[in-house]
């Protein structure tokens, strides 16, 4: 089967036409404009390609999904989260989880080369595209700060009542998992059932993610993305999933 090439005004083909090998490859071409990305994610499609390649669009079957109700932190992480919850409202707390206070830095850290990987798909062009989408209010960072330093976090796409996880990083033990746990609490508070994890990995499976048939995934997001947007704003995120303004900086609440 010949891979469809998308011009600027070409719609995506049906996801059922995606290749089986490589699994989920649907089309190539087009661009990473906010409008094109919104169209893609709303239909269960995402871009993934190496720098120097044309843009490749994917919709694998099955799809890796973390149901928020099935999030399964390890015993040691649960213990650490309980300890954090006891001190999180203390202004002097060493560890704090925030939303959208350092999006560009999170994106940059997620794009850094990983051990055992030859490169990264989060190229400068991808970073620019998602930064533009963040400015439009559809991409968000969840950040773990320790002693005033960014220690880990993740970013993802939010459409309606659906969240699409993109990438995460950690510079300290459990830092990205702590951010994920707080994100799950926020999403559950706002009746978001699933986080799209895109592809199957052992790391995500250990946290409770499971593969679901693509048809079921598409059926779910068709309803979820049509729901009202979540109340995202920059601030501190507590373990119950509530957002709070940051402490005053020069007398101004953030």
UniProtKB/Swiss-Prot annotation:
Its EC number is 2.3.2.6. It is an enzyme of class 2 (transferase). InterPro entries: Acyl_CoA_acyltransferase, Leu/Phe-tRNA_Trfase, Leu/Phe-tRNA_Trfase_C, Leu/Phe-tRNA_Trfase_N. It catalyses: N-terminal L-lysyl-[protein] + L-leucyl-tRNA(Leu) = N-terminal L-leucyl-L-lysyl-[protein] + tRNA(Leu) + H(+); N-terminal L-arginyl-[protein] + L-leucyl-tRNA(Leu) = N-terminal L-leucyl-L-arginyl-[protein] + tRNA(Leu) + H(+); L-phenylalanyl-tRNA(Phe) + an N-terminal L-alpha-aminoacyl-[protein] = an N-terminal L-phenylalanyl-L-alpha-aminoacyl-[protein] + tRNA(Phe). One of its GO terms (cellular component) is cytoplasm. Gene3D superfamilies: Leucyl/phenylalanyl-tRNA-protein transferase, C-terminal domain, Leucyl/phenylalanyl-tRNA-protein transferase, N-terminal domain. GO terms for biological process: protein catabolic process. It is found in: Cytoplasm. Keywords: Acyltransferase, Cytoplasm, Transferase. Disulfide bonds: none annotated. Its main location: cytoplasm. PANTHER family: LEUCYL/PHENYLALANYL-TRNA--PROTEIN TRANSFERASE (PTHR30098), LEUCYL_PHENYLALANYL-TRNA--PROTEIN TRANSFERASE (PTHR30098:SF2). Functions in the N-end rule pathway of protein degradation where it conjugates Leu, Phe and, less efficiently, Met from aminoacyl-tRNAs to the N-termini of proteins containing an N-terminal arginine or lysine. HAMAP family: Leu_Phe_trans. This is Leucyl/phenylalanyl-tRNA--protein transferase.
């Amino acid at each position: 089967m010949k891979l469809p090439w998308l011009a600027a005004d070409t719609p995506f083909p049906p996801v059922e036409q995606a290749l089986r090998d490589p699994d989920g490859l649907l089309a190539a071409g087009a661009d990473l404009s906010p409008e094109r990305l919104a169209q893609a994610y709303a239909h269960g499609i995402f871009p993934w390609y190496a720098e120097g390649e044309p843009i490749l669009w994917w919709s694998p079957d099955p799809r890796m999904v973390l149901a928020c109700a099935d999030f399964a932190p390890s015993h040691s992480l649960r213990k650490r989260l309980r300890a954090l919850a006891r001190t999180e409202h203390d202004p002097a707390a060493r560890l704090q989880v925030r939303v959208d206070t350092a999006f560009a830095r999170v994106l940059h850290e997620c794009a850094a080369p990983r051990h055992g990987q030859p490169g990264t798909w989060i190229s400068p062009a991808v970073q620019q595209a998602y930064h533009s989408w963040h400015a439009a209010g559809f991409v968000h960072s969840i950040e773990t700060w320790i002693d005033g330093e960014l220690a880990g976090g993740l970013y993802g796409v939010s459409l309606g009542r659906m969240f699409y996880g993109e990438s995460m990083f950690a510079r300290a033990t459990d830092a990205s998992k702590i951010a994920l746990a707080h994100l799950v609490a926020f999403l559950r508070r706002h009746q978001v059932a699933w986080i799209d994890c895109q592809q199957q990995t052992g790391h995500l499976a250990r946290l409770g993610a499971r593969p679901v048939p693509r048809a079921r995934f598409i059926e779910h997001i068709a309803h979820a993305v049509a729901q009202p947007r979540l109340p995202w704003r920059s601030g501190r995120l507590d373990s119950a999933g509530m957002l709070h303004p940051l402490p005053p900086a020069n007398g101004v609440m953030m």
